Amino acid sequence: GGKIEDYTGADKSSRAYPLIAVTTTAGTGSECTSDYVVVDEAQNRKYGNSDRNVLPVLAVDDYELMMNMPASLTAGTGMDALTHAVEAYCSIDGALITSELAAAAVRLIFEHLEPAVISPDRKSREGMAVAQFLAGLAFGNAGCGLIHSMSHQLSAVYDLPHGLCNAILMPEGSRANRKAPEAEERYAALCEAVFPIESRDMTTGERADYLIERIEKLSEAVGTKRKLSELGVKMEDLSLLADKTLLDASLRHNIYKPDKEEIETIFRSLM
């Protein structure tokens, strides 16, 4: 009972109900996490929350149910899954199991997302169904980070698709995170796990750069590389968006702690 606002935060419910989740998109990982969002339309704010009682007792990931997804939805949800995996891999709360799940998800997404968008078949749909599940397990274990914290504000203030916002923010958000030395090492390690042949003779910095470049190229290939201004984002709102980002729960998992000016700079660079 009560108002939906009563359930913002962590473990606010009093009891669990048996929940069976059947996914129809390949992106959110909601069938295997205890996370959910609440949108406060009055304040244009999106809250990330977690409650052990919302974790499904059974999850059904059947790629047959995803066969008719439109290309734009496939691209957006797929890039959301990629963001889950990359941010979980770099999370300060990650462990070995996080890294293994996230790396496997990233490999599958780079293999299957573009075909699933351009010429979907059973192989690409199944690959993305598995990838988003693994990514969900990864971020359910270690959380997300800066990119999700910024994305939440864009989708709340402007009612924009969450996955598209993640896709737009991921390259520049990742470059900002590289200011932390340990972050560069994490991006480099993920690059080596996903692109072992291509990155064989690269330095740590080159591997981190290469991974981010490949993310950007994938976003362009599936049609999610856009300017924020094209989507109605206003320059005069960037300060407010940065303030809201700093309050977002996902930011606590991030490997680098940006200040308001840095967050504004990222938004501005994408206008």
Language model feature labels by segment:
Residues 1-94, 185-189, 193:
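A glycine/threonine-rich phosphate-anchoring loop and its flanking beta-alpha core
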Residues 27-28, 133-166, 248-252:
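Glycine-rich phosphate/pyrophosphate-binding beta-alpha loops
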Residues 71-134, 138:
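C-terminal and late-domain segments of enzyme folds
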Residues 82-86, 128-136, 170, 215, ...:
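Short alpha-helical scaffolding segments that buttress acidic/His motifs in well-ordered protein cores
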Residues 93-101, 116-127, 142-147, 201-208, ...:
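Flexible, glycine/charged-enriched surface loops at secondary-structure junctions
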Residues 157-237:
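Gly/Pro-rich interdomain helix-loop hinge
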Residues 234-271:
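Short, amphipathic C-terminal "tail helix"
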